[in-house]
UniProtKB/Swiss-Prot annotation:
Gene Ontology biological process: negative regulation of cytoplasmic translation
InterPro entries documented for this protein: CEBP_ZZ (IPR032296), CEBP_ZZ_sf (IPR038446), CPEB (IPR034819), Nucleotide-bd_a/b_plait_sf (IPR012677), RBD_domain_sf (IPR035979), RRM_dom (IPR000504)
One Gene Ontology MF term: mRNA 3'-UTR binding
Domain RRM: 430-512
Annotated region (Disordered), positions in chain: 17-46, 64-98
CDD domains assigned to the protein according to its UniProt record, in alphabetical order: Bbox1, RRM2_CPEB2_like
Protein's name according to its UniProt entry: Cytoplasmic polyadenylation element-binding protein 2
Keywords per UniProt: RNA-binding
């Protein structure tokens, strides 16, 4: 074997190990030639395909260029058309303006020519529109009141500018309603002075709320904070506060004036005797009982008698003279007669001497009374008769001496409760009792005060009595957060500042009735719990045995229970 073959065999590897190198050499040469011929054919075909695609792309480019040219031509044509239209419209507007100027000149000439030419003038098509509005306004005297409020010299004739302004304002109010402006327009004043009685009868059944806004169907108030409403037909409490009374006012004057709204009693508070209600609506206007010589001898005055602390009988001059000197003959230790007691007690602040008897107390006039009406409807009628000022509702009290301007403060039943959110449940263990709440304060005002001070307020209630549903001077505040509740009851006292109210109120845990003992009560056995431990270590209700059992430890000796009424 030649040297060249041996070298080739060594290159071929193990396939020529058995001496087959010559056959493999022939096969490899033929395969190489075939591969080269295939490559040449493939290259020729690729060149032809590239030429074809190039031609196609060239045609596509030409088509795109043609389309772009067409679009540009169309845009130019549209621009030309638009410019022509705009020019034509401007020319038409100029022509119309010239025509209007010419017609105005003709109208002025026709007015100057005389009454004969006035009859030949064409009728304005808008004149019927203005005439309809004039006829509509003629039946509404409040429109004249509105015009005269703007211009005092205005007449009954409604001019076109006013009608145009009214129409534009009406359309704007329909598109963008304004509740306050609608309320003002609804409450337009009646210009007829003599028609006051008719106006009062028409509004007799209206419901006036404490913030002087029109109530909604729930008898509540328009505010995003108010979620409460009245349950039942009543709106106001039958107990009404009347303030601003002078010292010379008499109870007979009060009864005589306010009895026009319904049967009532007068609750006259004083510093020494508390509240006395001695005028009964069932027998009012009947013959009065003869008053005794002194109110000290009357332990329980009969119903129907005017309050003995007030009398409409003026004291005799002799009585006044005796009361000034202290005795009949100028001696010492004068005995107080009926005239002297009436002067000291009825008018309040008398300067007569004190009695040497069994320590008679002199009544001091507080300047306010409470009216206890028999029906809630009477309070509504009273409120409709009042007039509004910045401080509240007022009415003119007609007395025997002179008319008196007094304040009327009704209590709206919806103001006794306030809910922050219906979705938050109320935990009875996180309810605080608020003592010393001013009576004019509403639940929503108390809620906002505690919300700003402690936060997490859920519900607020004002305690009211069962008979008249009038505030008792206390309230309840429910919290949703334990730490806020603990902070409130640990402070114990807080000063409440609201408008003209500046008073210190007491905060302590609220005790609920009919609570079961949380220490020994189970599902089938409920033990009444009269004690509640507000300490953070306990903080639960206990029955008496469990209280002694749980507080027998030295660490709980100092815990003080909360009991109802203490």
């Amino acid at each position: 074997m030649s040297k060249s073959r041996r070298v080739f065999l060594s290159i071929q590897g193990d396939d020529d190990f058995w001496g087959n190198g010559d056959q493999l050499e022939g096969k490899t040469l033929s395969s190489i030639k075939q591969q080269e011929s295939k490559k040449m054919d493939d290259s020729v075909e690729g060149m032809e395909e590239e030429k074809y695609f190039f031609r196609q792309s060239k045609l596509g480019r030409q088509n795109l260029e043609r389309l772009h040219e067409k679009e540009e031509q169309e845009c130019e044509e549209e621009r030309l058309d638009w410019s022509e239209k705009v020019d034509s419209e401007e020319e038409e507007e100029d022509i119309q303006e010239q025509d209007e100027i010419i017609t105005e000149g003709k109208e002025t000439e026709m007015f100057d020519s005389g009454p004969e030419t006035d009859q030949k003038m064409p009728v304005d098509p808008n004149e019927g529109f203005y005439n309809n509005y004039r006829s509509y306004f003629s039946g509404r005297p409040e429109m004249l009141f509105l015009i005269r409020s703007i211009d005092e010299s205005a007449t009954d004739y409604y001019e076109k500018p006013f009608i145009d302004l009214y129409e534009t304002t009406r359309k704007r109010l329909e598109m963008y309603p304004n509740t306050e402006l609608n309320q003002i327009l609804r409450c337009a004043c009646n210009p007829n002075a003599g028609g006051g009685a008719d106006y009062r009868v028409r509004n007799k059944h209206a419901v006036v709320v404490s913030n002087f806004r029109e109530p909604d169907r729930r008898l509540g108030r328009y505010s995003k904070y108010y979620y409460h409403h009245n349950v039942g037909p009543e709106v106001y409490s039958r107990k009404v506060f009347v303030g601003g009374l002078p010292a010379c006012v008499k109870e007979m004057d009060i009864l005589h004036f306010f009895s026009r709204y319904g049967r009532l009693q007068v609750d006259w508070p004083s510093k020494h005797y508390g509240c006395k209600s001695d005028s009964d609506p069932s027998v009012y206007n009947e013959p009065s009982f003869t008053p005794p010589t002194s109110h000290l001898g009357l332990s329980s005055p009969p119903f129907g008698q005017i309050n003995p602390f007030m009398t409409d009988c003026p004291p005799a001059p002799s009585d006044l003279q005796m009361s000034r000197h202290g005795s009949v003959d100028g001696g010492g230790g004068g005995f107080p007669t009926h005239g002297m007691s009436m002067r000291n007690i009825g008018f309040g602040g008398g300067s007569g001497p004190r009695s040497t008897g069994e320590g008679e107390k002199k009544q001091q006039h507080l300047g306010y009374v409470f009216l206890l009406f028999e029906k809630e409807r009477s309070v509504r009628d009273l409120v409709t008769e009042c007039f509004e000022e910045e401080e509240g509702l007022f009415i003119i009290l007609e007395s025997a001496i002179e008319p008196i301007r007094v304040q009327i403060r009704p209590w709206l039943l919806a103001d006794a409760e306030f809910l922050m959110d219906f979705n938050v449940p109320i935990n009875t263990k996180m309810v605080a009792f608020i003592g010393g709440v001013p009576r004019p304060l509403k639940a929503v005002e108390l809620a906002h005060f505690f919300e700003q001070t402690y936060g997490n307020v859920v519900c607020v209630g004002i305690d009211i009595d069962n008979k008249f549903k009038y505030p008792r001077g206390s309230g309840r505040v429910a919290f949703s957060n334990y730490h806020a509740y603990v902070q409130a009851i640990t402070d114990r006292y807080i000063v409440l500042d609201h408008e003209d109210i500046h008073k210190r109120v007491e905060i302590k845990p609220y005790f609920f009735h009919n609570q079961s003992c949380e220490e020994c009560s189970s599902r089938y056995h409920r033990q009444y719990a009269p004690f509640f431990c507000p300490s953070l270590e306990c903080f639960q209700y206990y029955c008496e045995p469990c209280w002694h059992k749980m507080h027998a430890r030295p660490s709980r000796f100092h815990h003080m229970p909360v009991v109802k009424g203490i």
